[in-house]
Amino acid sequence: MANKLTPENIEAAVQHLENIQSGVTPILDGVDRTVVEDAEVVEPLDLGNQVIKKKEKRVFPLIPPSDPRLLMQIAPFMDDTLEQFGFASRKELAEVMYDNMAKYGGLGLSANQVGLPYRMFIMGGHPEIEDGKVRCVFNPFINDISEESVMLKEGCLSFPFLFLGIKRPKWCSVRYTNEKGEEIEETLHGMPARIFQHENEHMNGYVFTDLVSKLKLERAEKAKQKIIKEVQKRQNASRIIT
């Protein structure tokens, strides 16, 4: 069972995402794009007892929200499809997905968000959530959800600087296989439950903007433009100083 989170910790997690996105997402000609060209050596990824030794990062650009690959239901994951994109194993795919999630500053990242047609996502890594526990999730399925719901502000790496209040079940009982092919069943509470539900929607071709009214989305878009202008100011000031 996940550790209980205080409202302060939850807000801190959301602020963490907002802060990191502000630092790594360039604004180009008024259109949000995140393009990464560098590669770097990073620390090993610890997935439970399995330590994956990392070499150079393979970083994929985030595809735009209108890309059909983000809007279609993803077929069940099969191990024999890994070679199509140059992956030797689930563990290697998990490593690359972790690199991308960390690079873009997310709390979760689905494979189709970076153009990979796999029914899998990675989530976790934030020190305030389950002590930074990372889950690599293949073929996710939600068995049950709580009757009680909670409204919280969410972000999505596919929609930089856009934050929406989303009402979700407080907990969810889930099933999936991990990077070792082991079947996992657990009940997630608080932020992990929210992240799992968010990423699972990506598996079925939905994005979080589908869950709110047109009016609510318009208001969030206006707030987003204010954030972008502020980020542009900081980026321009940084270029002048350096």
Where are these regions (language model features)?
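Positively charged
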Residues: 2-242
